[in-house]
Curated annotation (Swiss-Prot):
Binds 1 Mg(2+) ion per subunit. Disulfide bonds join C77-C83, C79-C222. Its EC number is 4.6.1.-. It catalyses: an N-(acyl)-sphingosylphosphocholine = an N-(acyl)-sphingosyl-1,3-cyclic phosphate + choline; an N-(acyl)-sphingosylphosphoethanolamine = an N-(acyl)-sphingosyl-1,3-cyclic phosphate + ethanolamine; a 1-acyl-sn-glycero-3-phosphocholine = a 1-acyl-sn-glycero-2,3-cyclic phosphate + choline; a 1-acyl-sn-glycero-3-phosphoethanolamine = a 1-acyl-sn-glycero-2,3-cyclic phosphate + ethanolamine. The lineage of its organism: Eukaryota, Metazoa, Ecdysozoa, Arthropoda, Chelicerata. CDD domains: GDPD_like_SMaseD_PLD (cd08576). Belongs to the arthropod phospholipase D family. Class II subfamily. This is Dermonecrotic toxin LiSicTox-alphaIA2aiii. It comes from Loxosceles intermedia. Mg(2+) binds at E57, D59, D117. Pfam families: GDPD_2. Its main location: secreted. Dermonecrotic toxins cleave the phosphodiester linkage between the phosphate and headgroup of certain phospholipids (sphingolipid and lysolipid substrates), forming an alcohol (often choline) and a cyclic phosphate. This toxin acts on sphingomyelin (SM). It may also act on ceramide phosphoethanolamine (CPE), lysophosphatidylcholine (LPC) and lysophosphatidylethanolamine (LPE), but not on lysophosphatidylserine (LPS), and lysophosphatidylglycerol (LPG). It acts by transphosphatidylation, releasing exclusively cyclic phosphate products as second products. Expressed by the venom gland.
Length: 305
C-alpha cells in the first residue's frame, strides 16, 4: 500500500509540473521588462528588485583613457532622485555578479537583465573602440568571472552617440581575443540618443550587427514626451524587414504614462518606481495581455502575438 501511495504522489507531482510547463508555453501575453532607473549603488540593486524590477539600468562613466570608472550619473538627473550615488565600476560589477549568480547568498532570481548606460560623451570618437575593449575586459573579469559561473543576467550596452558604434566591435573583439566569444550570446545593443530610426539602422550596419537590438526612446521624468518615435520603433520591430527586437520607453513614473506605453506595445518600461508599473500590470485591462518577463524569456527575440 505505501508503494501505491508513493506512485500516486509521484504521478501527481509530475502531472502538475507538465501542466505548468504547458501553461507557460501557452501563455500568449507579452513579457515586460520593468527596468529600475539609475541603479548606481550596490544597495540599490535589492531596493529596486524588491519594488518589482526584473531589470536595472546603470550609468557608466569613463576616464580620459576610456577606462570605465564609476557607476555615476551626476547632476542634473530625474526629478525626485538623488543624482550622486556611485560605486567604482568594478566593485559594482562584483555586487551585480552576487545578485545574479544562483546559489549566492545575495542572489535575486528576478533580476534578469542589466542596461549599461554608457556615458561616452566624455570620449573622443576615436576612443570608442578602445572603450569597448576595456569594458569587455572589466565585465569578463568582474562580472562573468572569466567565464566560470559568473553572473547570468543579460546585458544591454546602451550607447548615446551613433558615431560611437565602434565600441560594439571593440567589445566583441576583446571577448573573442580573451577566448569567450560565446558570452556575446548574453549581450544586446541600444542607441539611446533618440535619433531617426533609419539612422540607427545605418549605425548597426556599420557595426556589423544584426539581432540582439533593443531600441530606447524617452526623456527625463521632469519633461513630457509623446509616443510618436516609440510607435515608429514598434512599427520597425513588427515589420518583416525591421532590425529592432525590443522597444523600451523611459522614464515612466506615472500610471497614465505606463498605460499609454503598454497600449502602444512596448516591451520594456524604465522607471524610478517599479511598484507603479507592477500595479498597472495587475489591472484588469492589462493582466491578460502582459506579464512580467522571466529568465526563460529571450530578450533578443521579437515577441509574436
Amino acid at each position: 500500500l505505501p508503494y501505491i501511495a508513493l506512485i500516486l504522489v509521484c504521478w501527481s507531482v509530475l502531472s502538475q509540473a507538465a501542466q505548468t510547463d504547458v501553461e507557460e508555453r501557452a501563455d500568449k501575453r507579452r513579457p515586460i521588462w520593468i527596468m529600475g532607473h539609475m541603479v548606481n549603488a550596490i544597495a540599490q540593486i535589492d531596493e529596486f528588485v524588491n519594488l518589482g524590477a526584473n531589470s536595472i539600468e546603470t550609468d557608466v562613466s569613463f576616464d580620459d583613457n576610456a577606462n570605465p570608472e564609476y557607476t555615476y550619473h551626476g547632476i542634473p538627473c530625474d526629478c525626485g532622485r538623488s543624482c550622486l550615488k556611485w560605486e567604482n565600476f568594478n566593485d559594482f560589477l562584483k555586487g551585480l555578479r552576487s545578485a545574479t549568480t544562483p546559489g549566492n547568498a545575495k542572489y535575486q532570481a528576478k533580476l534578469i537583465l542589466v542596461v549599461f548606460d554608457l556615458k561616452t560623451g566624455s570620449l573622443y570618437d576615436n576612443q570608442a573602440n578602445e572603450a569597448g575593449k576595456k569594458l569587455a575586459k572589466n565585465l569578463l573579469k568582474h562580472y562573468w568571472n572569466n567565464g566560470n559561473n559568473g553572473g547570468r543576467a543579460y546585458i544591454v550596452l546602451s550607447i548615446p552617440d551613433l558615431n560611437h558604434y565602434p565600441l560594439i566591435k571593440g567589445f566583441k573583439d576583446q571577448l573573442t581575443q580573451d577566448g569567450h566569444p560565446e558570452l556575446m550570446d548574453k549581450v544586446g545593443h541600444d542607441f539611446s540618443g533618440n535619433d531617426a530610426i533609419g539612422d540607427v539602422g545605418n549605425a548597426y550596419k556599420k557595426a556589423g550587427i544584426s539581432g540582439h537590438v533593443w531600441q530606447s526612446d524617452g526623456i527625463t521624468n521632469c519633461l513630457l514626451r509623446g509616443l510618436d518615435r516609440v510607435k515608429q520603433a514598434i512599427a520597425n520591430r513588427d515589420s518583416a524587414k525591421g532590425f529592432i527586437n525590443k522597444v523600451y520607453y523611459w522614464t515612466v513614473d506615472k500610471r497614465a504614462t505606463t498605460r499609454d506605453a503598454l497600449d502602444a506595445g512596448v516591451d520594456g518600461v524604465m522607471t524610478n518606481y517599479p511598484d507603479v508599473i507592477t500595479d498597472v500590470l495587475n489591472e484588469s485591462a492589462y493582466k491578460n495581455k502582459f506579464r512580467v518577463a522571466s529568465y526563460e524569456d529571450n530578450p533578443w527575440e521579437t515577441f509574436k502575438k
